[in-house]
Structure formats: structure tokens, C-alpha cells
């Protein structure tokens, strides 16, 4: 069976889909974000950039499954906090959803799956858009499934809740989830060390002002909280465009707990639970279900974002499997 992806970024979605489908091409925006990484790992895969230049006629009636990962930023919790819950309606990136969905009409596949963050299904998020697309898909003769899933129950080594809009010509049976307890961060790191030794890969960087506080940061604690213990509010100095506190660490930098499941990966921000450093990119890839030898092109500091912005391979494999069974 044949598949085609849209907005696949570094290629995590394709890694999972390829276990069940022959992937024909990627359709990307222009310029294609992380195209060099996708090319390094799938050198023979055609990648078409720019929605106006997608060769739709070339692939019409030749694709069984279209899988899509349009940008989720319009529905991120951070964006909603700063810009308001309805800001997504004016975000130009939601066009990526329409470009992907329209391939149902243009390619006539047996199925399509579009992934995003759960807030796209919230009444205060993109729910009206989801229902609009649902009605359109049903009029085209497709059955629609709204799938909310935590990736840890598909074999992923961390918790990652995501929404999938799935339209199929045949009945979909989203079953076979594994609800056994997911491995803890400590167990995953031990497994990584047993398989790959001490080579953690590129260690993500911290600022010099953050490093002195690492030894004081407890498991399960934000480095910002640690910093604030040593720097009471009366000592804070604000500056910059948003009036932030100078020298205070990013809120996303947490020291993980060995006894708990790793939370969602949003970049290379996590602090190792037992060593005073951030994670290495190979450790992060292992947590995310990527091969540790996956080739990430571009600046090393971008690898965390490359991993975080896509669909994790184990989740992609699960979605591809249930879609294939429906076909």
C-alpha cells in the first residue's frame, strides 16, 4: 500500500508509517522546515516544497493513505495565554490544515490522518474547524474518527497526548493499546545506557548563569524554582521587550524524576535526573522513539526542536497500523 505525507518536518511520522506503507513523497511548505534532515534519512524520497507546486495530479488515485502533521502552534497553550483563545482563527498557519484536508478531494485516498495538540479539539480551541472538516469528509463518503491518545500507550517512552483527525472509507477500529505502566525516566535511561553506553550525543547547552544552580535543583523541580529560592523577588531586575526577570531560567527547564514517566518533550530543555547537565540528543531521541543514529542536520542546538515538532515514530506506527487494517 502507498502513503504520502504533508508537513512532516524531520521525519518522525514517516519512520512509523514506513513500517506499514510504501511512502511515495512528502509535500512541504516552502522552504521545507528540516528538509535536510528528512533527506539525510530518506535520500530517495521526493520532497515537494510550496503548496502551489504540490504535484497533485501525479499522485491522484495512487495513494492509499495521506498522513499529515500541520503546525500545532495556533493551538498551543502558550499561544492561547498570550494572544487569546480565539487567536487561532487569524493564524495563517491553519491554512496547512486546509491544504492537507483538501488532498481527500484531490488525491482520493482511502484514508487521511491529521495530527495536532489536544487543544485543537477544545471548545476554546479549534473544535469548530474540526467539526467543519468532519462534515465535509462525511459528505465525501468517509467515516470520521476523532482520536485522543497518549503516546505512552503505543510504546513511546514518554507521555505525549495528541489528537488525530482520521477519515477512512472503511470502518476504523482503534484498538490494541497497551495500558501497562510506561517505563519511568530512570528505567529508560538505564535501558539506553545498557544498549548504547555512555555516549549521550550532543549535550544541549545551558547558559553560564544557570549552571551554578544545577547542583541545587531537585528531581521534579523547575530550575526557575531553584533560582527563585536563591533570588527573592525584591532582588529581581526586569528588562527586555516583555519585562522579563533578567537571569531567571526558562520555565521549561525541569530536572526529571527517575521514578516518574517522562513528560511531553518540547525541545532540548530537560535536565538529567542524576547528572548536572541537560539531556544529550541521543538520549532524547531514545525517549522519543527515534533510532539513536538518526541523522539530524543543521545546528546541533536545533535537534531538540526537530524531535519535538513531529509525530513520534511509535505513535505514527500505531496510527498507520490501524489505518492499514481498516483498508
Residue spans for each PLM region:
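Short, solvent-exposed polar/charged micro-motifs at secondary-structure junctions
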Residues: 56-63, 155-159, 307
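S-adenosyl-L-methionine-dependent DNA methyltransferase catalytic core
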Residues: 2-22, 35, 136-140, 162-327
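Short alpha-helical segments and helix-capping/turn motifs at coil-helix boundaries
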Residues: 50-54, 148-152, 248-250
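Short, flexible, glycine/charge-rich loop motifs used to bind or transfer phosphoryl groups or to couple energy/partner
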Residues: 54-57, 102, 154-155, 252-255
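Proline-centered helix-kink/hinge sites
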Residues: 70-71, 109, 157, 291-292, ...
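Core alpha/beta nucleotide-donor-binding catalytic domains of modification enzymes
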Residues: 2-108, 118-128
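Conserved Class I SAM-dependent methyltransferase catalytic core
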Residues: 93-167
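Redox-cofactor binding/interface segments in oxidoreductases and associated redox assembly factors
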Residues: 67-68, 114, 267
Amino acid at each position: 500500500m502507498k502513503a504520502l505525507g504533508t508537513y512532516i518536518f524531520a521525519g518522525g511520522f514517516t519512520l512509523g508509517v514506513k513500517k506499514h506503507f510504501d511512502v511515495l513523497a512528502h509535500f512541504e511548505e516552502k522552504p521545507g522546515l528540516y528538509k535536510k534532515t528528512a533527506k539525510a534519512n530518506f535520500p530517495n524520497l521526493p520532497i515537494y516544497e510550496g503548496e502551489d507546486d504540490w504535484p497533485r495530479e501525479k499522485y491522484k488515485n495512487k495513494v492509499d493513505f495521506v498522513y499529515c502533521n500541520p503546525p500545532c502552534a495556533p493551538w498551543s497553550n502558550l499561544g492561547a495565554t498570550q494572544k487569546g483563545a480565539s487567536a487561532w482563527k487569524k493564524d495563517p498557519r491553519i491554512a496547512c490544515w486546509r491544504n492537507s484536508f483538501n488532498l481527500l478531494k484531490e488525491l482520493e485516498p482511502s484514508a487521511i490522518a491529521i495530527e495536532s495538540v489536544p487543544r485543537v479539539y477544545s471548545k476554546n480551541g479549534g473544535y469548530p474547524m474540526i467539526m467543519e472538516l468532519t462534515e465535509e469528509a462525511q459528505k465525501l463518503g468517509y467515516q470520521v474518527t476523532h482520536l485522543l491518545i497518549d503516546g505512552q500507550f503505543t510504546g513511546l517512552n514518554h507521555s505525549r497526548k495528541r489528537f488525530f483527525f482520521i477519515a477512512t472509507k472503511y470502518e476504523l477500529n482503534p484498538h490494541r493499546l497497551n495500558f501497562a505502566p510506561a517505563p519511568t525516566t530512570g528505567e529508560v535511561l538505564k535501558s539506553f545506557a545498557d544498549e548504547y553506553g555512555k555516549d549521550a550525543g550532543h549535550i544541549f547547552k545551558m547558559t553560564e548563569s544557570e549552571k551554578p544552580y544545577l547542583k541545587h535543583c531537585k528531581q521534579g523541580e523547575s530550575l526557575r524554582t531553584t533560582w527563585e529560592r536563591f533570588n527573592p523577588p525584591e532582588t529581581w531586575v526586569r528588562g527586555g521587550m516583555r519585562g522579563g526577570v533578567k537571569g531567571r531560567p526558562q520555565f521549561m527547564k525541569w530536572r526529571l524524576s527517575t521514578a516518574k514517566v517522562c513528560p511531553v518533550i518540547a525541545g532540548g530543555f530537560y535536565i538529567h535526573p542524576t547528572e548536572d547537565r541537560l539531556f544529550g540528543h541521543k538520549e532524547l531521541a531514545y525517549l522519543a522513539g527515534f533510532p539513536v543514529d538518526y541523522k539530524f542536520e543543521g545546528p546541533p542546538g536545533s535537534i531538540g526542536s526537530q524531535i519535538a515538532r513531529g509525530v513520534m515514530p511509535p505513535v505514527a506506527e500505531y496510527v498507520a497500523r490501524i489505518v492499514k487494517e481498516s483498508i
